[in-house]
């Protein structure tokens, strides 16, 4: 059943992004304001990196560097693993497991950013689908 659900059906569409030169102080402010645990870094509409809360803590705070002196490209994770919007959630789960990641930027055929998929969305999608099918089957 999960093999029929595509990434674009469950991805976050309201993705917060910054550019390579955004100061980390601003990145953290955006993460706090919108309650995001990951921010994508884009250049010309295409994702170039991702900054997670862990990245902020390990690469900036732990290094004891003032956040106003660090820019996104110094902190973000790269190379970036992305997934096509028409891939199945099963394919997404396999990619997440293979690369030990919790966030997958979602791109269209041209490589432009269209969303973000996180591990929670994948985990919640399968039981939700099972529940819908259970209700359907019980009606008969």
Features from the language model and the residues they span:
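Short, flexible active-site loop motifs that bind/organize anionic cofactors or intermediates
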Residues: 14-17, 46-47, 82, 112
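A glycine-centered beta-loop-beta connector
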Residues: 31-34, 39-54, 96, 104-120
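Tandem CBS (Bateman) regulatory domains
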Residues: 1-14, 52-84, 88-97, 116-140
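The conserved cystathionine-beta-synthase
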Residues: 17-35, 42, 82-100, 107, ...
């Amino acid at each position: 059943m999960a093999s029929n659900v595509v990434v674009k059906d469950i991805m976050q569409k309201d993705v917060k992004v910054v550019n390579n030169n955004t100061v980390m102080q601003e990145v953290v402010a955006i993460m706090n304001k919108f309650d995001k645990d990951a921010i994508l870094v884009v250049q010309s509409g295409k994702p170039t990196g991702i900054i997670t809360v862990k990245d902020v803590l390990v690469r900036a705070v732990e290094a004891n560097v003032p956040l106003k002196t660090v820019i996104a490209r110094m902190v973000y994770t790269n190379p970036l693993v992305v997934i096509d919007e028409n891939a199945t959630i099963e394919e997404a789960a396999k990619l997440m497991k293979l690369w030990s990641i919790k966030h997958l930027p979602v791109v269209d055929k041209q490589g432009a950013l269209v969303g973000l998929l996180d591990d929670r969305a994948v985990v919640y999608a399968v039981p939700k689908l099972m529940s819908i099918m259970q209700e359907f089957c019980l009606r008969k």
